């Protein structure tokens, strides 16, 4: 219910401003029925304008919605580049093995080298927290560019291993810093949705990036997908510099203070869910082709279309879960979606011989 005191104070202030305004109307020979005399115009004059160029600090909302959208798009470009860098190996591994004169098993170590880089690079975030998130993101984007260029030009297997390790270093740290930036860019009602938009680049990489990289490798060269990732990383560097506003560093709680949250059980549960989820994704990537071709009866040449459908499920699930988490409890949304995934997996196990049904259930699983 409106406060009567505030309402009467506002009315007195408005009556105090009216004589001066009427004098100005008389001087300019403006009639009382002029649009400038309408209630909407008076309200606009009474509303103070928000200063431009406001720095984004903790707890401060971004006034201009365009700044928020551009910032989130720039962050999503970064996750798109990382998604392509990570998953590009799945479709071009045989081509790399032939190009470098190595076995498939040796080529598989290139995936492990990237994973080791991810594990080594993520802790760097603990020593870089005193800097602005924008500055950290720029450094990480430069590392993404360096790793992609080295992968594209590596002449030997040893150099390719080192290049994949370097390419993996910014992965974990980027997701951590970009999540902080996305939360600080959004208002209180849309923080979860902002993070889902940032992560959407990873799912888009599965939808378009992986099939495109496979086609480029098969028709031109396995080095072309890495050139594409390098160009994308260059765009990420530019868009972060151009579109992401300045964000103040997080408060310094000391080195030990950064790990105080681990005393709670919630972070460990989230870590376990993340480990199991990522492990499941890589198992799915490893065995989806024999499942769909041997059990589902699909021809091998249709696998690229099935992968596009799976990527579409990831995009829809990512964006939908973000919106639902803004409205309901994130824990409740996660529990419901995982229950649907478990049911779909059990149906795939029992009904794998029905190809199109299995394909539809596969999309449901990737959406979850």
Q: Where in the sequence are the language-model features?
A:
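Helix-breaking motifs and short loop linkers at transmembrane-helix boundaries and internal kinks
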Residues: 101, 153-159, 297, 329, ...
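Extracytoplasmic
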Residues: 77-109, 122-125, 284-289
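C-terminal transmembrane helical hairpin of 12-TM major facilitator-type secondary transporters
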Residues: 331-368
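Helix-loop-helix hairpin linking two adjacent transmembrane segments in secondary transporters
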Residues: 157-159, 188-242, 287, 291
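Cytoplasmic helix-loop-helix junction between adjacent transmembrane helices
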Residues: 163-201
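Conserved MFS/SLC helix-loop-helix module at the cytosolic interface between two early adjacent transmembrane helices
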Residues: 120-158
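Helix-to-loop junctions at the C-terminal end of transmembrane segments
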Residues: 122-133, 317-329
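Paired small-residue
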Residues: 147, 158-167, 356-364
């Amino acid at each position: 219910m409106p406060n009567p005191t505030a309402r009467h104070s506002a009315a007195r202030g408005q009556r105090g401003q009216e004589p001066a305004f009427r004098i100005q109307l008389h001087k300019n020979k403006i009639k009382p029925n002029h649009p400038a005399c309408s209630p909407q115009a008076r309200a606009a004059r009474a509303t103070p304008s928000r200063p431009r160029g406001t720095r984004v600090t903790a707890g401060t909302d971004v006034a201009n919605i365009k700044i928020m959208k551009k910032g989130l798009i720039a962050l999503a470009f970064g996750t798109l580049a990382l998604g392509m860098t990570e998953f590009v190996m799945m479709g071009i591994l045989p081509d790399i093995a032939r190009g470098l004169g190595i076995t498939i098993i040796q080529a598989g170590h290139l995936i492990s080298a990237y994973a080791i880089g991810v594990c080594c690079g993520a802790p760097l975030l603990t020593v870089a927290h005193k800097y602005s998130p924008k500055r950290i993101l720029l450094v990480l984007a430069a590392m993404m560019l360096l790793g992609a260029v080295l992968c594209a030009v590596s002449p030997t297997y040893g150099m390719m291993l080192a290049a994949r390790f370097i390419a993996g270093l910014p992965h974990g740290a980027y997701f951590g810093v970009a999540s902080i930036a996305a939360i600080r860019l959004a208002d209180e009602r849309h923080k979860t949705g902002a993070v889902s938009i940032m992560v959407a680049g990873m799912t888009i990489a599965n939808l378009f990036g992986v099939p495109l990289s496979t086609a480029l490798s098969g028709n031109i060269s396995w080095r072309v997908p890495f050139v594409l990732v390098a160009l994308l990383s260059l765009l990420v560097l530019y868009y972060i510099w151009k579109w992401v506003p300045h964000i103040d560093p997080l408060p310094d709680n000391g080195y030990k203070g950064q790990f105080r949250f681990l005393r709670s059980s919630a972070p460990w549960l989230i870590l376990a869910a993340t480990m199991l989820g990522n492990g499941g994704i890589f198992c799915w990537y490893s065995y989806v082709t024999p499942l769909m071709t041997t059990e589902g009866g699909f021809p091998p040449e249709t696998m690229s279309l099935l992968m596009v459908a799976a990527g579409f499920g990831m995009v829809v699930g990512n964006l939908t879960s973000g919106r639902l988490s803004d409205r309901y409890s994130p824990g409740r949304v996660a529990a419901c979606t995982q229950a649907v995934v478990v049911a779909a997996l059990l149906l795939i196990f029992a009904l794998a011989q029905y190809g199109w049904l299995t394909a539809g259930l596969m999309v449901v699983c990737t959406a979850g």
